[in-house]
UniProtKB/Swiss-Prot annotation:
This is Putative F-box protein At1g55070. Disulfide bonds: none annotated. SUPFAM superfamilies: F-box domain. It comes from the Eukaryota. Gene3D superfamilies: 1.20.1280.50. Residues 29-74 form the F-box domain.
Length: 393
């Protein structure tokens, strides 16, 4: 006689366990007990996000464990060792995702071998990658006259299309942020609605809470006490639960500034500043600017006064000449600056440039990636210190 009972694990996970007078046996006549739920969870916690994604298809038990609402407590996201880059290439109607380790002490002989994860068919009207945080990437595309935003997981290859925003609204800024306390992703969108033919318009802020497995996603309007113009193509950056992006106040006396959106409280703050490029510098908000002879790094120090510290680095002789190429500034967890182009030609070797600020040395590192077929010019997006995530499952 087989009995069924509910067993509660320490992780507040309820599983159905079968009790029988007979234990399971294999063909050799040996008997074995069923694997306890807590041991299953411990085994799963050792797997990578890519392997765990495959386990969802093994059986309903594994799928239910991985899809639990308290997934972040059962399987906390860990930074890989050594740190890795995630590369997302767009070309030929395909979206390719690769990862590679970050070199510990790069030199001219260093090379990064990218490991392929997924390639996803995307529409030809794909526009650009907007932002990335905590393992997820956000991009947008056009469907007729509507702009549609998509959240994409490069490791699992899954994506979710977000609800279409209000018609007749101009989208000024869009980004995804992460609340590390409540373990939640939120999407912020700033839109404006013009009145008649004049320059007057209403600015609106909307937030969407992105939760695993939730079907009825919707936008909520929130209040912001200050009116400003956003820098539409500025991607911004999320650091420790705060989303930073560039803007300009509508009041001429205030001028350029940085908007600080607290993902958890959904409150706005403002810093008067003209940021050429925002970076995450060792867990602090940074701003970097390249002049003819030097590189200027500004770091926002912690504290109520929000003071900026300034660091000037004279460019070494081996400084690369990008000759008008659109370059993205990145910073590794060790504080090394990394320069990479936003586009590249698959027929030409692709390089990243590491700049050691302390030793004032620039090293060129080749990235070996498979050629993307059918495309002569590829949109490139790189994220340092990447961590795996199982969201969108």
């Amino acid at each position: 006689m087989t009995k069924r009972k509910q067993q509660d694990t320490k992780e507040n996970l309820t599983l159905t366990v079968f009790e029988s007078n007979k234990r399971c046996s294999n063909s050799g006549g040996e008997y074995f007990d069923r694997i306890p739920a807590d041991l299953v969870i411990k085994i799963l916690s050792k797997l990578s996000a890519k392997s765990m994604a495959k386990c969802r298809c093994v059986c309903k038990l594994l799928s239910s464990i991985i899809r639990q609402p308290n997934y972040n407590q059962l399987f906390p996201i860990k930074y890989p060792d050594p740190p890795r880059f995630i590369f997302t290439f767009l070309g030929g109607g395909m979206l390719f995702s690769y990862t590679s380790t970050q070199p510990e002490n790069p030199d001219e002989n260093s090379s990064l071998v990218a490991t392929a994860h997924h390639h996803t068919d995307i529409p030809r009207d794909f526009s650009q990658i907007l932002s990335s945080v905590h393992g997820l990437v956000c991009y947008h595309r056009k469907i007729k006259n509507d702009t549609v935003f998509v959240i994409y997981n490069p490791i699992t290859g899954q994506y979710v299309t977000l609800p279409i925003l209000e018609a007749h609204a101009t989208i000024n800024y869009f980004a995804i942020g992460y609340d590390p306390i409540n373990k939640r992703f939120k999407v912020l969108c700033v839109t404006s609605v013009h009145h008649g033919t004049g320059e007057e318009f209403d600015s609106q802020h909307q937030v969407l809470t992105f939760e695993t497995g939730r079907r009825n996603l919707f936008w909520r309007k929130i209040q912001c006490r200050r009116h400003y113009y956003t820098h539409r193509y500025h991607k911004g950056i999320c650091i420790k639960g705060v989303l930073y992006y560039a803007a300009t106040s509508m009041k001429p006396m205030l001028g350029p500034m940085i908007v600080c959106f607290d993902v958890r409280s959904e409150k706005f703050g403002f810093i008067t500043w003209k940021p050429p490029s925002l970076i995450n510098y060792k867990g602090k908000l940074g701003s970097i600017n390249s002049n003819d002879n030097d590189l200027v790094l500004w770091v926002l120090e912690h504290g109520q006064e929000r003071k900026w510290s300034k660091h000037i680095y004279v460019k070494p002789l081996q400084w690369p000449e990008f000759n008008g190429i659109d370059v993205n500034f990145l910073v590794t967890s060790k504080g090394e600056a990394v320069f990479c182009p936003n586009h590249y030609d698959p027929q030409v070797p692709f390089y990243l440039y590491y700049y050691n600020l302390e030793e004032n040395i620039v090293v060129r590192v080749r990235v070996e990636v498979p050629e993307s077929q059918g495309s002569k010019r590829v949109l490139f997006h790189a994220v340092p210190n990447y961590l795996e995530n199982m969201k969108l499952t």
